[in-house]
Structure formats: structure tokens, C-alpha cells
């Protein structure tokens, strides 16, 4: 086709412009479409360019561009222009140059990025315009961040010898951006900059150049990026030490003191001693060699020589020598004298007579001995007379100085019907008070002085006699009347997990020995005129269906007190152990009670108590004290609020007392750290013929869903062989955390190589995965070692399971009534029950105490429950005396006031 001549200049200009444009694009990637003749300095340049970003989960990302001078800025993503409505634009003027400035922002969502398929990545770029041309920014790539759950390669457990190299491989999960890797040793970060013996390779493997004993630990590979943090399975690394011989000792002395014998020398496998399952030393530890010792020759006397001529002193002599044979090679010297003399004139020689001075000396010694005897006899008579004077009655003695023994109250007049006689404890020295019993409801309130050293003044003008009591007819009649009441319910008898007794308004105490479980019945808790037979029972977990939901766990024994439905006018106090580590941030604790229909109900949420509640609980480190006016079946249940919630487990190691076979079993029990659980295991082991072989330990078990592992190590292979087929045993987490399974244990079976082997030395490890652990070093003779037997001697808890009346309380009745009457009324100076609660560290329960008719009685009842039978009355007396009541006349009691 022919072109008109006038069009050639136009076509030539278009081609020239295209060539210039291509040349400019090659020279600069950021400049495009310059205006012919424009100043290049006025082309847009970017102050802020978009950068590579990652989308985490579903959160959109923000891209920002800022250029000067710029009249327009638009984003282009994957070659397509972003809609104008999606741009957020800010215009301004540069303060230094006066040129127009523009800033543009857009959001990129996960859905936009996911629309791009194939190998192409999602990118965005800014294009800025000015009057001189356009400029393109750098490309920003937008990627979706993620981190897979499973590691491509996890570290494995290893056992290495000392100074051997360790390589723990780890390939982290696939992720964008690629995961960073760090290592944990027993939950502590491994920092190669602080430990030159450790480094991490580019492939993320952990390398220990030379293994040390301190490198025995659980190692965990941790991968993390901006999305998540992943942990591998922990790999247990055990650095063992093979045994090495020490140097030989010096040869011993020859076994025969005379003639042919033996010498020996020894060495021990302690350089180093085998550790963590390392091999025992090879070879003999004793060497023997023959020896010969010269026999000692004892000396013997030769024959006596002839007598010498008679001397001027009328004696002559003879001699002998120790030469037949002479002593040699350590033999004994001759015994006897080597020179013998005698009178040579017989009766013609004069004999020396005793001097008169010797006779006088003997007479003087006899006289001194007689005087000493008479003096000792006189001193003895004086001592006996003084002792008789000390046996007289003691008047006006303070009850505090008499030890607060149980009080036997006898009527002073036959026509007084309100006086009772309580049978005393015949095994102790008691104090008899002759007078009437002051009740808090009768007559004016007694008061006593607290500002001086003792707790109370002498009791009126009554007479106090210290003596050993014997049963009286009045006491026998009272007990018989209590036992013949016909309106109480009959109860089962003869079980070791039960206590029962008959009580009236004087109160008392029930205890199940060796369990930490007791029931305190304060005075006036039972209405006057009523007599109840009350029981206290410990239930086995398998006999009670206690529903536990979610993360709940049983922290205490299940205890019943009854009979249910009896009328009580004051709260009784039920005491029982628990195995929780109290922490308001880790536990939600609830007191559960079984209803008459058999269902369990939450009757108290600890920490949310109110004075109107029928129940109240004082929680301490190892025990809880429940105030209740309704008897029934109770249990303390905890619900974990975090993985820091901890239960105390007691670990006990038992083995047979007698071992007649080659096999020897070590039983490791993991039970609640409560007295009742210990009692059950001890009774079981007595039936099995077991003995304790190591001191018990306490392990803190966390709510981390990790199991409890048990393993045995360092068993001498030359003496014993372990029949365990795996490196460790496990008790599942839920078996322990549920708290309702008894006798949880693992058994390690060892086999003796020789039937004569009796010494056992090994280690038993018990630990929670990624948690607390304990190690037992066993060094035990299985035939005669009984050094741990005394640890099983359970402490007695006050003798009889039931105590009735004043003998059940540390504080005597009259002193108790005085304290109540003095501290119940409010005092402007603070000398009342509130200050007493603060001194006894019970001020967190002031609202509960204040809701009761007698707050002081509640405080004293709790003190009795916490401190019986070993409470320090001196400390209580000091706390009461420190309140500073000023009037000395307020605190005197006489028989007339009663």
C-alpha cells in the first residue's frame, strides 16, 4: 500500500519516540513515559515503597506508597490495576520543596492471594504520575504464612558415654516464613554463646562436642515463626560413665604370724564409679600372693648360778640369764627376776618390827570413815523429812501451772442436782476441783485478768489437790446412763476406719487413728437434755461413686459423720487431710456433700463463702477444717484452672522382708500425700510381707496431661539382672489425677545372678514428663537391713478414738467460759475477739465468726481442732494475755459466783 508523502514525518516521529521510550526503560526501571523536554528531577520518586509481607491467619495486610512530586498514585497487583475505591489517599505538600506529595494505602486480603493459582506469587506495585512522567515502585510479594504441626524429623532418646559426642537431629515442620529452631534442655533455653561445648548446625541439629554428666536431660526441639510455635517430643539423653579401677592398695600384712601365709591387696571400681547404667569394671578387685614370716622365738631362762658367799648384810644371791634361748624375731622377753637373794644366817639375823607410827595411822583412817558415814546418815534423814512436807495439799494453784489436765468435778453438797462427775483418764495425773461448774448461761459472766503472765487468777477459795484418781461410783453411774438411752441409732462396730461415741451437751471428739481425720463436737453443740451416738467413718474410694467432671480431682478422703438429721445448735468441725497445693490462681476448690437421695452437691465454693452459708472451711497447707451444723458425707474436690495446679504425691518403695527365690521385687507406690492413703498402703504391705527400703519422698504432680514415668538404673550387672523389657514404666495421667484409684504402683523385678547375693545398690527415678521428679539411691542388704522400719511407726493420735467431755479439749471448761465472756463484747480499744483472731492468723474469717452468737467460741473451737493433742497452751495464753484487759477485778471467779 502506498503512503502519502505527507505522512512520512509523522510515522518517523512515532518510531523515534518508541525507540527513545525503550532506551529509557533499559536505563532506569523506575522511569517511564517522560514528557519530551521535561526536567528529570521533577519525575516522581518514592519516599515509601511497598515491602514483602505475610498474611497471618485471616488478617489483611496493609501496603503503603508515598511519592513526591506526585499527582496520582495507583496500585497494580499481579498485572491488574486496583480499583480506585480501594485506595486510601492522603495529599500534602512537601515543606522543604513545596512539591505535591501523595500517600496511598490499600488492604490485601487472604482471599485475594488465594485466587492466584500455580507457581506465580501474588505481588503488588505502585505507579506514580507527575507532570514530568511516571515512576514504578519495587514489587512487594504477599504470601500466606503457616506452620505445619508435625516435625519432618524429631530427636530420639540416646545413651552415650562420658566425653562422647552427641548429635540430636531436628527437621522443623514446613512453613512460610521458614521456621526458626531453638533447643530446650529441661525446659531451659540452650544458648551456644554461653556454652562453647554446644552448637546448632545449619540443618538445626544440636551437637554436643563432649558429653558431660550435666548434659543428662530431656531435650526438646522448638520451631517457631510468626504464625505458631511447635514442640517436638522430648528426647531423654543419658550420659553414662563406665567404671574404672582405682590404684591398688598396699599389700596387707601376712595372714600367718609364723610360717607360710597369704598377703592381699585390693582396688575398687571408683575411678570413676559407674553411673547412669555404665559398665562395671572388668577384672578382679582382689589379688593374693604367698608370704613367709619368721617365727618369733620367746626367751627362756638359763639355770641359776651357784649362791654367792654370805655378805656383811647377812644375805647371799644367785643369778640367771634370758639366753636359753634368747628372744628373737619379736619373741617375748623372759618373765621373772634375773637375781635372787635370801638370808644366809637363818634365825641368827634380826627381823624388823612394825613401828608405833603405822598403828596410829590406821586408827586415824578408821575414825575418818566412821565420821563420814554418820554425816551421810544425818543428811538422808533431813531429806526424807522435807519430802514428807512436800506431799501436803496444794491450795490456790493455777490451773495453767497444773498442765491443763482433764477436770473431775465432784459435788460439794449432796442436795445440788446440777453437778456432774466425769470419769477421768486413769492413765494420767488429773486435777480435782472441789466446787460447782459455772455454765455460760447461768448467773453473771465471769471475767479474768489477761495483762499479767498467767492466763487466769486462782479459782476463788476452792481447794485443788493433785492426785492419781480412781473410778468413782458417780462416774460409773453417769456412763451407764449415757449407754442405756434407747432413742439413738445402732451403728456397726469393730472397723479400723470408724470411730463412734455417745455425747451430750458437754461435747467431745472422735478420731480415726493414723488418718488425720477427726470430728470436734464443741460444748453446747448438742442441745441440753439430748444424748446422741455419733459416728465418724472413712470410706474407700472404690466404695463411693463420686462423679468428677472435666478437670476435677479428688483432693481429700471421703468422710461421713452422722447420723444425718440430728439437731445441732453449734457447728461441729470436721478435720481431714488434702493433697492439693492451695493457690487461688491455680485451683477452684469445692466442698461436696452427698444428699439423702444419693446425689453429690456443691455446698461450698472456697473463696466465695458468705456468713449465711451453712458450711465454712478453713484451708491450710495439708488439712482442711469444715464447720457444719448438718452431718453427712463430705469430700474436697478441686478443679484445675491452669497447668500450674499441683497435687502432692507421696512416693514409697517396698520390697519383701524375706527373699527365698532368685527374684526380688521392688514396688514403687504413688499415692496421695495424706495420712489415710499412707495407712492403707502400710496395712497392705504388712499383709504382703513387705518392708520400706528407702525414705519416702514427695513429688509435685501438675495438671499438664503428662504421664508419670518410673525407671531403674545402675543395677550391677555382675550381681543382678533386670527383667524389665523397656527402659521405663508409665502410670497414665488420668489414673493419678482422678484421685479415686487406690494402691497405684509399678513393680521392678530383679533377678540375682547368685543366690548368695544380698547387697543391692541401684537408682530408681520417678518423674512426670516435663515436670517434677525424684531419685532414690538404694543401697540395701535384702536379708538384714531394717534401718527404715522405724519410718513406718505411725504416730498415735491421742489414744482412744472417742473422748467425751472435758478430756476432749486442751482448754479447761472454766477458762474457756472466761475467755468467751471477756472477748465476745466489742471493745473500743480492740481488746476483743477480732484482735484474738488476728493474733491466731484467722482474720480472713471475721465475717463468719461475727455471724455466730459467740465469735470467741468459734475461734477457740477452731484452735482446738487444729492443735489437739499437741497444742501449745502457752502460746494461746500469750495471745490472750497480749490483748491487754486493764481491770484485774474482771477476771476472778469464786464458788459463790458459780
Curated annotation (Swiss-Prot):
Site entry (Cleavage), positions: 396-397
Ranges facing Extracellular side: 26-361
Main localization, broad class: membrane
Residue stretches making up the Death domain: 817-897
A GO molecular-function annotation: netrin receptor activity
Reported modifications of this chain: Phosphorylated on cytoplasmic tyrosine residues. Phosphorylated by PKC in vitro. Proteolytically cleaved by caspases during apoptosis. The cleavage does not take place when the receptor is associated with netrin ligand. Its cleavage by caspases is required to induce apoptosis.
Subunit note: Homodimer and homooligomer. Interacts with the cytoplasmic part of DCC. Interacts with MAGED1. Interacts with PRKCABP, possibly mediating some interaction with PKC. Interacts (via extracellular domain) with FLRT2 (via extracellular domain). Interacts (via extracellular domain) with FLRT3 (via extracellular domain).
Signal peptide: 1-25
Tissues where this protein is expressed: Mainly expressed in regions of differentiating neurons. Expressed at early stages of neural tube development in the ventral spinal cord. In developing hindbrain, it colocalizes with a number of cranial motor neuron subpopulations from embryonic E11 to E14, while DCC is expressed by motor neurons at E12. Also expressed in non-neural structures, such as the basal plane of the hindbrain and midbrain, in the developing hypothalamus, thalamus and in the pallidum.
GO biological process, one term: netrin-activated signaling pathway
Domain notes: The ZU5 domain mediates the interaction with MAGED1, which participates in the induction of apoptosis.
Family note: Belongs to the unc-5 family.
UniProtKB keywords: Apoptosis, Cell membrane, Cell projection, Developmental protein, Disulfide bond, Glycoprotein, Immunoglobulin domain, Membrane, Phosphoprotein, Receptor, Repeat, Signal, Transmembrane, Transmembrane helix
Membrane topology classification: Single-pass type I membrane protein
GO cellular component, one term: membrane raft
PANTHER family in the cross-refs: NETRIN RECEPTOR UNC5, NETRIN RECEPTOR UNC5A
Job of this protein: Receptor for netrin required for axon guidance. Functions in the netrin signaling pathway and promotes neurite outgrowth in response to NTN1. Mediates axon repulsion of neuronal growth cones in the developing nervous system in response to netrin. Axon repulsion in growth cones may be mediated by its association with DCC that may trigger signaling for repulsion. It also acts as a dependence receptor required for apoptosis induction when not associated with netrin ligand.
PROSITE patterns: IG_LIKE, TSP1, ZU5
Protein known as: Netrin receptor UNC5A
TSP type-1 domain sequence ranges: 242-296, 298-350
Domain Ig-like C2-type, residue spans: 155-238
Residues on Cytoplasmic side: 383-898
Species this chain originates from: Rattus norvegicus
Amino acid at each position: 500500500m502506498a503512503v502519502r508523502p505527507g505522512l512520512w514525518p509523522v510515522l518517523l516521529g512515532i518510531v523515534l519516540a518508541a525507540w527513545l521510550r525503550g532506551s529509557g526503560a533499559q536505563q532506569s526501571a523506575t522511569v517511564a513515559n517522560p514528557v519530551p523536554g521535561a526536567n528529570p528531577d521533577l519525575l516522581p520518586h518514592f519516599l515509601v515503597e511497598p515491602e514483602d509481607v505475610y498474611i497471618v491467619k485471616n488478617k489483611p495486610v496493609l501496603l503503603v506508597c508515598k511519592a513526591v512530586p506526585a499527582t496520582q498514585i495507583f496500585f497494580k497487583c499481579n498485572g491488574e490495576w486496583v480499583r480506585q475505591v480501594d485506595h486510601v489517599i492522603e495529599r500534602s505538600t512537601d515543606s522543604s520543596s513545596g512539591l505535591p506529595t501523595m500517600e496511598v494505602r490499600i488492604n490485601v486480603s487472604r482471599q485475594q492471594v488465594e485466587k492466584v493459582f500455580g507457581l506465580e506469587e501474588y505481588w503488588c506495585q505502585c505507579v506514580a504520575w507527575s507532570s514530568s512522567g511516571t515512576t514504578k515502585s519495587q514489587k512487594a510479594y504477599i504470601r500466606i504464612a503457616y506452620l505445619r504441626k508435625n516435625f519432618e524429623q524429631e530427636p530420639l532418646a540416646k545413651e552415650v558415654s562420658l566425653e562422647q559426642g552427641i548429635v540430636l537431629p531436628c527437621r522443623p515442620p514446613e512453613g512460610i516464613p521458614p521456621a526458626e529452631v531453638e533447643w530446650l534442655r529441661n525446659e531451659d533455653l540452650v544458648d551456644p554463646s554461653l556454652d562453647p561445648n554446644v552448637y546448632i548446625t545449619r540443618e538445626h541439629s544440636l551437637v554436643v562436642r563432649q558429653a558431660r554428666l550435666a548434659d543428662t536431660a530431656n531435650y526438646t526441639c522448638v520451631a517457631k515463626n510468626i504464625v505458631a510455635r511447635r514442640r517436638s517430643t522430648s528426647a531423654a539423653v543419658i550420659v553414662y560413665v563406665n567404671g574404672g579401677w582405682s590404684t591398688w592398695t598396699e599389700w596387707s600384712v601376712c595372714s600367718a604370724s609364723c610360717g607360710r601365709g597369704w598377703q592381699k591387696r585390693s582396688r575398687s571400681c571408683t575411678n570413676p564409679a559407674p553411673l547412669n547404667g555404665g559398665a562395671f569394671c572388668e577384672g578382679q578387685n582382689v589379688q593374693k600372693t604367698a608370704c613367709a614370716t619368721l617365727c618369733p622365738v620367746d626367751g627362756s631362762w638359763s639355770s641359776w648360778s651357784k649362791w654367792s658367799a654370805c655378805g656383811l648384810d647377812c644375805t647371799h644371791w644367785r643369778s640367771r640369764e634370758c639366753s636359753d634361748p634368747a628372744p628373737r624375731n619379736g619373741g617375748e622377753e623372759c618373765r621373772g627376776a634375773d637375781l635372787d637373794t635370801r638370808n644366809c644366817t637363818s634365825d641368827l639375823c634380826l627381823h624388823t618390827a612394825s613401828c608405833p607410827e603405822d598403828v596410829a595411822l590406821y586408827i586415824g583412817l578408821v575414825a575418818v570413815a566412821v565420821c563420814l558415814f554418820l554425816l551421810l546418815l544425818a543428811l538422808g534423814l533431813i531429806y526424807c523429812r522435807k519430802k514428807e512436807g512436800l506431799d501436803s495439799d496444794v491450795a490456790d494453784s493455777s490451773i495453767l501451772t497444773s498442765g491443763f489436765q482433764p477436770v473431775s468435778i465432784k459435788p460439794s453438797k449432796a442436795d445440788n442436782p446440777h453437778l456432774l462427775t466425769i470419769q477421768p483418764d486413769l492413765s494420767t495425773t488429773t486435777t480435782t476441783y472441789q466446787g460447782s461448774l459455772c455454765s455460760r448461761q447461768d448467773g453473771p459472766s465471769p471475767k479474768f485478768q489477761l495483762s499479767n503472765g498467767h492466763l487466769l487468777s486462782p479459782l476463788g477459795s476452792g481447794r485443788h489437790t493433785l492426785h492419781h484418781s480412781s473410778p468413782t461410783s458417780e462416774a460409773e453411774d453417769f456412763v451407764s446412763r449415757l449407754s442405756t438411752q434407747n432413742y439413738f441409732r445402732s451403728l456397726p462396730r469393730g472397723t479400723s476406719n470408724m470411730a463412734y461415741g455417745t455425747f451430750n451437751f458437754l461435747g467431745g471428739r472422735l478420731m480415726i487413728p493414723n488418718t488425720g481425720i477427726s470430728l470436734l463436737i464443741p460444748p453446747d453443740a448438742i442441745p441440753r437434755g439430748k444424748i446422741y451416738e455419733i459416728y465418724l467413718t472413712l470410706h474407700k474410694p472404690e466404695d463411693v461413686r463420686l462423679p468428677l467432671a472435666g478437670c476435677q480431682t479428688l483432693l481429700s478422703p471421703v468422710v461421713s459423720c452422722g447420723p444425718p438429721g440430728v439437731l445441732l445448735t453449734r457447728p461441729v468441725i470436721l478435720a481431714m487431710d488434702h493433697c492439693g497445693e492451695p493457690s487461688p490462681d491455680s485451683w477452684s476448690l469445692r466442698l461436696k456433700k452427698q444428699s439423702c437421695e444419693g446425689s453429690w452437691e456443691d455446698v461450698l465454693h472456697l473463696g466465695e463463702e458468705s456468713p449465711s452459708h451453712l458450711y465454712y472451711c478453713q484451708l491450710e497447707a495439708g488439712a482442711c477444717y469444715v464447720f457444719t451444723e448438718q452431718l453427712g458425707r463430705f469430700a474436697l474436690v478441686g478443679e484445675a484452672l491452669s497447668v500450674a495446679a499441683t497435687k502432692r504425691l507421696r512416693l514409697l518403695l517396698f520390697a519383701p522382708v524375706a527373699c527365698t527365690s532368685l527374684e526380688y521385687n521392688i514396688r514403687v507406690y504413688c499415692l496421695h500425700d495424706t495420712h489415710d492413703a499412707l495407712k492403707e498402703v502400710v496395712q497392705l504391705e504388712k499383709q504382703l510381707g513387705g518392708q520400706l527400703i528407702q525414705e519416702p519422698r514427695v513429688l509435685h504432680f501438675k495438671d499438664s496431661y503428662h504421664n508419670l514415668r518410673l525407671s531403674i538404673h545402675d543395677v550391677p550387672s555382675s550381681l543382678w539382672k533386670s527383667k524389665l523389657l523397656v527402659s521405663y514404666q508409665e502410670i497414665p495421667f488420668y489414673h493419678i489425677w482422678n484421685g479415686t484409684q487406690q494402691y497405684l504402683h509399678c513393680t521392678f523385678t530383679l533377678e540375682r545372678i547368685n543366690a548368695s547375693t544380698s547387697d543391692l545398690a541401684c537408682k530408681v527415678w520417678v518423674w512426670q514428663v516435663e515436670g517434677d521428679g525424684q531419685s532414690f539411691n538404694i543401697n540395701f542388704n535384702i536379708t538384714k537391713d531394717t534401718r527404715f522400719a522405724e519410718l513406718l511407726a505411725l504416730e498415735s493420735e491421742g489414744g482412744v478414738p472417742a473422748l467425751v467431755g472435758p478430756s476432749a479439749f486442751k482448754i479447761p471448761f472454766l477458762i474457756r467460759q472466761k475467755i468467751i465472756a471477756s472477748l465476745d463484747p466489742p471493745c473500743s480499744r480492740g481488746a476483743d475477739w477480732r484482735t484474738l483472731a488476728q493474733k491466731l492468723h484467722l482474720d480472713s474469717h471475721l465475717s463468719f465468726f461475727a455471724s455466730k452468737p459467740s465469735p470467741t467460741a468459734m475461734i477457740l473451737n477452731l484452735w482446738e481442732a487444729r492443735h489437739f493433742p499437741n497444742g501449745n497452751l502457752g502460746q494461746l495464753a500469750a495471745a490472750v494475755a497480749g490483748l491487754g484487759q486493764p481491770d484485774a477485778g474482771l477476771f476472778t471467779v469464786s464458788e459463790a459466783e458459780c
